[in-house]
Every structure is written in structure tokens, then in C-alpha cells.
């Protein structure tokens, strides 16, 4: 499988992709550079496909990749409900795309490049 090196060694690149994929699942929209977004798109699509499968093996594979972070905290009837990024993937995001075969993300190019190095910036979001 082809991939971009993104100017990092393999461990740093994998950690960055895991972190940014988790952030996209939690926030459903992030701003990043165009090349990073193209790589994040691949991993996010795979995680959502695993979420749609929903069996134990898919949950374990997704749990191995998605970081264990808190996605949402809210109160329900005198109880505080804490939802992790993995729970959000399987309970909120995957059912939303049950009738859709791929193409779960959308990228918008921003008009202004990044200030320091003029890197092209995009907004990547879940459809």
C-alpha cells in the first residue's frame, strides 16, 4: 500500500495519523494541511468501515488504532455520561453511514495558505 512519509519516521507518522484520525472522529471536522488530510482520509474511512461491521473483531481492530480519549460528557437524569471516541465511532458515526459505501469524508480547500510556510490548508470533515 502506498503512503506519504510526511517528513517523519514511521513511529512518529503512525502516532500522528492515529491522533488526527481520533480527533476527526471526536470533532467530526479538523483543519490541517492538504497532504495530511489525504492520509487521514484513508485511515478514517477504514475505521468507519470497521464501525459499520460492528463485530468483536472489528471493535478490537478499531480499538487498537483509535486512541482512548473522551469524546463527549453530558448529564442524563442525575448521572454523568462519558462517551469515548471508540463508543462514538460505533454508536453514532457508523449507523449514520449504514447505507453509504465509502466516501465518508469531505475536504474543502481554504483560500489562505498557512502563514509560516504557505502550506495549502484544508478542512476535512465527515459528510
Curated annotation (Swiss-Prot):
Q: Name one Pfam family in it.
A: Ribosomal_L17
InterPro entries found in the cross-reference section: Ribosomal_bL17, Ribosomal_bL17_CS, Ribosomal_bL17_sf
Q: Which GO terms describe its biological process?
A: translation
GO CC, one annotated term: cytosolic large ribosomal subunit
PANTHER family the record matches:
LARGE RIBOSOMAL SUBUNIT PROTEIN BL17M (PTHR14413:SF16), RIBOSOMAL PROTEIN L17 (PTHR14413)
Can you state the subunit structure given in the record? Part of the 50S ribosomal subunit. Contacts protein L32.
Family of the protein in this entry: Belongs to the bacterial ribosomal protein bL17 family.
Q: What is this protein called?
A: Large ribosomal subunit protein bL17
Q: Which organism is it from?
A: Lactobacillus gasseri (strain ATCC 33323 / DSM 20243 / BCRC 14619 / CIP 102991 / JCM 1131 / KCTC 3163 / NCIMB 11718 / NCTC 13722 / AM63)
Question: Which gene codes for it?
Answer: rplQ
Amino acid at each position: 500500500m502506498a503512503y506519504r512519509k510526511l517528513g517523519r519516521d514511521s513511529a512518529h507518522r503512525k502516532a500522528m495519523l492515529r491522533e488526527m484520525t481520533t480527533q476527526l472522529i471526536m470533532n467530526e471536522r479538523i483543519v490541517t494541511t492538504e497532504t495530511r488530510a489525504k492520509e487521514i482520509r484513508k485511515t478514517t474511512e477504514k475505521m468507519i468501515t470497521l464501525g459499520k461491521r460492528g463485530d468483536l473483531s472489528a471493535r478490537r481492530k478499531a480499538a487498537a488504532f483509535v486512541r482512548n480519549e473522551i469524546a463527549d460528557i453530558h448529564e442524563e437524569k442525575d448521572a454523568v455520561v462519558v462517551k469515548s471516541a471508540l463508543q462514538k465511532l460505533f454508536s453514532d458515526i457508523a449507523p449514520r453511514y449504514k447505507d453509504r459505501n465509502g466516501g465518508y469524508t469531505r475536504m474543502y480547500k481554504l483560500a489562505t495558505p498557512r502563514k509560516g510556510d504557505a502550506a495549502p490548508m484544508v478542512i476535512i470533515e465527515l459528510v
